[in-house]
Amino acid sequence: MTTAPQPSTWRKIFSRKMLICIFTGFTSGLPLYFLINLIPAWLRSEHVDLKTIGLMALIGLPFTWKFIWSPVIDLVRLPFLGRRRGWMLVTQIGLLLTLLIYAFLNPAQHLYVIMGLSLVVAFFSASQDIVLDAFRREILSDEELGLGNSIHVNAYRIAALVPGSLSLILADLMPWHNVFIITALFMLPGLLMTLFLAKEPDIPPSVSRTFAQTVSDPFSEFFSRKGIKQAILVLLFIFLYKLGDSMATSLATPFYLDMGFSKTDIGLIAKNAG
């Protein structure tokens, strides 16, 4: 009995599914690096103090705590585009619009608005990560998962070059207003992917569950597995383990600026080579 020939690696790489993985990685990485690279550079350029910029690292908490509302996104089906693509579209439109709002803000006058807006961006970005991860897992077979995830992660890293390099270079050439508009428009490829390239996964319906079951059962199981004390320790670890790294990352670009490097220097060297 002969087995069917397997497609070559190159054919797998240049398939529709892997192209989608490029888009999911890029559109997932852009908002995160916008927050941790571009916003601190902008704030320091506008003479915001380092203490405030360091505290801005707390806006990354939605990325750590997204497991809390992920059951809701998994259960609630929006009335357009399907279970996954509907949420993808909502989060991507939300990100595009919120990133554009920065173009009309001034840290000297709207610092607290910027903090609140950054928290909203983090929430939309974390929610997008939830649905993109689920979507990618459902469209990829077990054999395709390794390649698809590696492509996704590499595209995620490439996305860092937009707010972390290109936008910083542009900030030396044009007003921040224009920089934010250009950076926000890089969300459009992911949005177009959702509308025209991605197809809703053909997944058979699972056993019907109530909203309460979907939301409460995972937490009940988590707290009952090894007791409340152990669960709280795990949650504290999740909350704290990235906090120091996040604060250090958010202060890296302001540190370079204070040392006298231009934004072009930082964009070309620290963010590209580093």
Model-predicted segments: where are they?
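Symmetry-related core transmembrane helices of the 12-TM Major Facilitator Superfamily/SLC fold
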Residues: 90-97, 177-196
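C-terminal ends and interior cores of transmembrane alpha-helices
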Residues: 88-109
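Transmembrane alpha-helix termini and helix-breaking/packing motifs in multi-pass membrane transporters
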Residues: 71-76, 103-104, 161-181
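Helix-loop boundary and gating motifs at the non-cytosolic
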Residues: 5-63, 230-237, 241-255, 259-262, ...
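Juxtamembrane intracellular "pre-TM" segments in multi-pass secondary transporters
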Residues: 2-14, 201-234
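Cytoplasmic helix-loop-helix junction between adjacent transmembrane helices
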Residues: 120-155
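Glycine-rich segments within core transmembrane alpha-helices of 12-TM secondary carriers
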Residues: 63-66, 146-171
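A membrane-interface helix-boundary motif in multi-pass transporters
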Residues: 81-88, 112, 169-186
